[in-house]
């Protein structure tokens, strides 16, 4: 399986206590996390247009039809299949996957075939199709309580279904879609479009706010953990932190403070005090969400061998593709298109480990409560790395084309992947003591 695919704050924000930079001492202590999110009843007083009331847990309707076995799509990476379940209803590349956050028993996938499906992880059984899209479905996700599922296609058509009834409850046509995300504690959907707008809708009423950025695409975004702010990155390298209630930008980073190319990804730490942004300029910037100031810049170090790039292509081809914070140590991971996984020590702002893949990294995710980071790449393999040592723990194979997205269950027992081979796969993760 060695051959490679051809396709390439508001005033309430806690102080920046995690940025007490010090010397060369070894990082061995667990970072004390924020005691928890603010009470939803408090938030509703501050965002009167959003309902934060907890909704009762409902069991999803599990009626549906069982997938018939289908022939695999022959690709360029034949080899062993470590997966437990394969979902094969898509007829083209599968671009996105998300798991329902309440039970982690359902997945939603969207693909190049203009289709999205909600299906069960345990056996691949289809629950329902999210029908009616007219372009490639590039975004899909469940609401915070798993009662709603949203899908979005490249043309900007967004749709929301009630999971238990399988009925469409809302739709909207925005501009060309760049990203989409649910609010962490309310039935509120956010999306960024190519005209520079960030949209926020209350679902299913459709109450809407827009946040106008520069006249260029809003390429990535993330709601901060407090639910009151969002960080959005733009094609011109600008970063904006928005107040979701007031509709104004709290901080704007541009020019030398921003990036020198389009932003590709953004992440926040667990208490929302720090933001990481990545760009095609190959830089990852560490930003204080409180002050809006850049407090660290990470750049890739030269790697002797770059199997996935031709000679002299690194400066033109490399970029930051994915990044994220460890929840238990002051570490951040950055994944690059050239296949480099860089683990940075936030306390000393130094490179701690550099782990090389044979082809470009598509996405990375940290396992909750540990220092293990997962990567998926263009060679069709999922890898698990110990960020403390830089050691490869294990890998999972089974796709015959590049992996385009993946999701990790809350207990890290399942990895769900999507691929250019028209398949989604479920892998059972063997979890040794971390």
UniProtKB/Swiss-Prot annotation:
Chief localisation class: membrane
Subcellular location: Cell membrane; Cytoplasm
Function as written in the Swiss-Prot or TrEMBL entry: Plays a role in angiogenesis and cell migration. In smooth muscle cell migration, may act through the RhoA pathway.
WD repeat coordinates: 89-129, 132-171, 173-212, 214-254, 258-299, 315-354, 356-395, 398-433
UniProt KW keywords: Angiogenesis, Cell membrane, Cytoplasm, Developmental protein, Differentiation, Membrane, Phosphoprotein, Repeat, WD repeat
Alphabetical list of PANTHER family matching this protein: ANGIO-ASSOCIATED MIGRATORY CELL PROTEIN (PTHR19857:SF8), MITOCHONDRIAL DIVISION PROTEIN 1-RELATED (PTHR19857)
Top-level division of the source organism's lineage: Eukaryota
PROSITE patterns: WD_REPEATS_1 (PS00678), WD_REPEATS_2 (PS50082), WD_REPEATS_REGION (PS50294)
Nucleus listed as a keyword: no
Keyword Repeat: yes
GO biological process: angiogenesis; cell differentiation; positive regulation of angiogenesis; positive regulation of endothelial cell migration; smooth muscle cell migration
UniProt name for this protein: Angio-associated migratory cell protein
Amino acid composition bias (Acidic residues), ranges on this chain: 39-62
């Amino acid at each position: 399986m060695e051959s490679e695919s051809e396709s390439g704050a508001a005033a309430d924000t806690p102080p920046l206590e995690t940025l007490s930079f010090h010397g060369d001492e070894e990082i061995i202590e667990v970072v004390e996390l924020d005691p928890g999110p603010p009470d939803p009843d408090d938030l509703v007083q501050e965002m009167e247009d959003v309902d934060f009331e907890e909704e009762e847990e409902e069991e999803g309707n599990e009626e549906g039809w069982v997938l018939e076995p289908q022939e695999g799509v022959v690709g360029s990476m034949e080899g062993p299949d470590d997966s437990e379940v394969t979902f094969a209803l898509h007829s083209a590349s599968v671009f996105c996957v998300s798991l329902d956050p309440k039970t982690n028993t359902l997945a939603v996938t969207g693909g190049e075939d203009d289709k999205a499906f909600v299906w069960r992880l345990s056996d691949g059984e289809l629950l329902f199709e999210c029908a009616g899209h007219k372009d490639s479905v590039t975004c899909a996700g469940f609401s915070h309580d798993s009662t709603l599922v949203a899908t979005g296609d490249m043309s900007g058509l967004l749709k929301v279904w009630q999971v238990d009834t399988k009925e469409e409850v809302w739709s909207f046509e925005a501009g060309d879609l760049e990203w989409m995300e649910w609010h962490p504690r309310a039935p509120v959907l956010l999306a960024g479009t190519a005209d520079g707008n960030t949209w926020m809708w209350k679902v299913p009423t459709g109450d809407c706010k827009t946040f106008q950025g520069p006249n260029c695409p809003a390429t990535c975004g993330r709601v901060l953990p407090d639910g009151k702010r969002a960080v959005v990155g733009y094609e011109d390298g600008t970063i904006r932190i928005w107040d979701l209630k007031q509709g104004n930008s709290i901080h704007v980073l541009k020019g030398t403070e921003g990036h020198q190319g389009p932003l590709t990804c953004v992440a926040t730490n667990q208490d929302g005090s720090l933001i990481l942004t990545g760009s095609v300029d190959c830089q990852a910037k560490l930003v204080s969400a409180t002050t809006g100031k850049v407090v660290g810049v990470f750049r890739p170090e030269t790697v002797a061998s770059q199997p996935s790039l031709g000679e002299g292509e690194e400066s033109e081809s490399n970029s930051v593709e994915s990044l994220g914070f460890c929840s238990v140590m002051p570490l951040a991971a950055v994944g690059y298109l050239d296949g480099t996984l860089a683990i940075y020590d936030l306390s000393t702002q130094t490179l701690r480990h550099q782990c090389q893949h044979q082809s470009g990294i598509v996405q990375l995710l940290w396992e909750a409560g540990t220092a293990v980071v997962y990567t998926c790449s263009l060679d069709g393999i999922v890898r698990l790395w110990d960020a403390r040592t830089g050691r490869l723990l294990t890998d999972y194979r089974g796709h015959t084309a590049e992996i385009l997205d993946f999701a990790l269950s809350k207990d890290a027992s399942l990895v769900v992947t999507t691929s250019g081979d028209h398949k989604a796969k479920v892998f059972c993760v063997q979890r040794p003591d971390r």
